[in-house]
Each structure stands twice: as structure tokens, then as C-alpha cells.
Swiss-Prot record:
Catalyzes the reduction of two molecules of cytochrome b5 using NADH as the electron donor. The modification Phosphotyrosine is found at Y43. This is NADH-cytochrome b5 reductase 3. InterPro entries: CBR-like, Cbr1-like_FAD-bd_dom, FAD-bd_FR_type, Flavoprot_Pyr_Nucl_cyt_Rdtase, FNR_nucleotide-bd, OxRdtase_FAD/NAD-bd, Riboflavin_synthase-like_b-brl. Keywords: Acetylation, Cholesterol biosynthesis, Cholesterol metabolism, Endoplasmic reticulum, FAD, Flavoprotein, Lipid biosynthesis, Lipid metabolism, Lipoprotein, Membrane, Mitochondrion, Mitochondrion outer membrane, Myristate, NAD, Oxidoreductase, Phosphoprotein, Steroid biosynthesis, Steroid metabolism, Sterol biosynthesis, Sterol metabolism. The gene is CYB5R3. The keyword Lipid biosynthesis applies. Its EC number is 1.6.2.2. One of its GO terms (cellular component) is mitochondrial outer membrane. One of its GO terms (molecular function) is FAD binding. FAD binds at R92, P93, Y94, V109, K111, F114, K126, M127, S128, T185. A lipid is attached at G2 (N-myristoyl glycine). SUPFAM superfamilies: Ferredoxin reductase-like, C-terminal NADP-linked domain (SSF52343), Riboflavin synthase domain-like (SSF63380).
Length: 301
């Protein structure tokens, strides 16, 4: 009788255990592993691909620890790359252009500042030239997440005044964005997060400044998003040196551009900025003030 009960128990428990094991595997698969577990730890990631986007712009793809890993970077945050270059530790911030939903890899689009191309910076960019010199299989150290802003979805932003302060929550219906050059990467990160959620009705207005038309980073990605989400994403360019047949603005960011292409102050939008410090200090902030956007609703990455 005992043997029969033992056999019966085995017959009953085996399917239950099988189902339990299957559910546990599915649960583990649905919760991807996070690479950036602590902002205080450096993670060595391997270069697995390089794409030439233009004469001075590259897309670098780095492998995460496993095909099941995501980077684990909240929307609005950035990472730091660090490397020993000519005997000195060089650290630079970057915002990935890949989605944090992407498993197994992270993409960075970086403009390479070559030496002897800009008279004010004859040595060029240390980190960007180092990345350009990397071979497939080489590694570099990532650290993060870092930053004072996190987009939590549905128009809600958590913004810390400084690293030691608790975040202040700002909920908006529209977001104004002013980007200059490589400052487009954090904007694209936020725009993608908003557009991929059909229940997020936040409207994004992007004013993107560059020197020439060929300098416009990530233009195909931006225009694809605009075409797919025309009601929620408004895109406008301005160039320092525009071609003759140019449908957008020409010149530095000014009061008129902000009035025409960013949401009005009456909507109480949040205005995000990212670009060269002189652009933020002399073009963005004074003209935003003239239009009527209060400082507490403006944030510079």
C-alpha cells in the first residue's frame, strides 16, 4: 500500500513540479538582467560593431554581459565612459541611442572630433578619437546610471535640483526641446519613450540646431518618428549655414524660433535643453525668458 501511495504521489507531483518549473523559467525570462546595477561600479563592455554614419560620426555597438541583459538606464539618464588615454584617465558622458528594451547590446552615436580640424582644439577630442581607434573585441568601461532627470511616463518627470536633493515631480502635457549637435541624444531617448507608449499623450516639440545640413545627427530616426507620430511629435531644424533650398530656419536659436516652434508658456510645458554651453547660456535661456518660460520649468542636461 505504501509503495502504491508513493507511486501515486510521484504521478501527481511530477506534472505539478513540471508546471512550477516552467512558470519559474517564464518569470525569469520576462525579467531581464540589468547591467548597470550600481552607478559606483565600472562595467567593462566589448565593442562588437562599428557603423560609419558620416565622415565624422560613428555608431558604436557594445555587447552587454549576456543576450538576456538590458543596460538598465532610466529614461533621461546617461552613462560615463572612462579610459586611460596617453597615461591619463579620461571620462566623458554619453546617452545611448538604443532603447533600454534592447537586449544584449547598447548603441552609442558619437561625433569624432579629429585633431587638426578645429583651430581652437588642434588636439581634437580625446575620447572620441580613442573610440575611433578601438578594434572589434576591445573593451571600455561604462558607469551609470547618472543624471538629475528621469522620465517616469505619462508626462511625469522627476527632477533633482542637485545630486543630494530629492526629486521634484513635474507633470506636463507638452515638452519643449532645444538640442544642439550631439545634444540630440538625450532628446531622442525621451521622445522614443513617449512615442512608444500609445497611452502617453505628451506632445514633444523639438528645435534642433546644427551648423550645416550634413551635421544633423540621427535625422532619419527623427523624421521617421515624426512621420509615424505627427500629432505628438513636432520637429523643426535651424542651421548656421543653410543650403539655398532649405525649408526650415537659418541662424542661431532666437526668440522667434522659440515662439513659433516650442509650446507656449501658457501650456506650462517643461523645456529641455542640451548642447554646447554657449548655446544654452546665450541663445536658449535669455530667449526662453523673453518668451515667458520660467526658469523652474527649464532643464539643461
Amino acid at each position: 500500500m505504501g509503495a502504491q501511495l508513493s507511486t501515486l504521489g510521484h504521478v501527481v507531483l511530477s506534472p505539478v513540479w513540471f508546471l512550477y518549473s516552467l512558470l519559474m523559467k517564464l518569470f525569469r525570462c520576462s525579467t531581464p538582467a540589468i547591467t548597470l546595477e550600481s552607478p559606483d561600479i565600472k562595467y567593462s563592455l566589448r565593442l562588437i560593431d562599428r557603423e560609419i554614419i558620416s565622415h565624422d560620426t560613428r555608431r558604436f555597438r557594445f555587447a552587454l554581459p549576456s543576450p538576456q541583459h538590458i543596460l538598465g538606464l532610466p529614461v533621461g539618464q546617461h552613462i560615463y565612459l572612462s579610459a586611460r588615454i596617453d597615461g591619463n584617465l579620461v571620462i566623458r558622458p554619453y546617452t545611448p541611442v538604443s532603447s533600454d528594451d534592447d537586449k544584449g547590446f547598447v548603441d552609442l552615436v558619437i561625433k569624432v572630433y579629429f585633431k587638426d580640424t578645429h583651430p581652437k582644439f588642434p588636439a581634437g577630442g580625446k575620447m572620441s578619437q580613442y573610440l575611433e581607434s578601438m578594434q572589434i573585441g576591445d573593451t571600455i568601461e561604462f558607469r551609470g546610471p547618472n543624471g538629475l532627470l528621469v522620465y517616469q511616463g505619462k508626462g511625469k518627470f522627476a527632477i533633482r535640483p542637485d545630486k543630494k536633493s530629492n526629486p521634484v515631480i513635474k507633470t506636463v502635457k507638452s515638452v519643449g526641446m532645444i538640442a544642439g549637435g550631439t545634444g540630440i541624444t538625450p532628446m531622442l531617448q525621451v521622445i522614443r519613450a513617449i512615442m512608444k507608449d500609445p497611452d502617453d499623450h505628451t506632445v514633444c516639440h523639438l528645435l534642433f540646431a546644427n551648423q550645416t545640413e550634413k551635421d544633423i545627427l540621427l535625422r532619419p530616426e527623427l523624421e521617421e518618428l515624426r512621420n509615424e507620430h505627427s500629432a505628438r511629435f513636432k520637429l523643426w531644424y535651424t542651421l548656421d549655414r543653410a543650403p539655398e533650398a532649405w525649408d526650415y530656419s537659418q541662424g542661431f536659436v532666437n526668440e522667434e524660433m522659440i515662439r513659433d516652434h516650442l509650446p507656449p508658456p501658457e501650456e506650462e510645458p517643461l523645456v529641455l535643453m542640451c548642447g554646447p554651453p554657449p548655446m544654452i547660456q546665450y541663445a536658449c535661456l535669455p530667449n526662453l525668458d523673453r518668451v515667458g518660460h520660467p526658469k523652474e520649468r527649464c532643464f539643461a542636461f
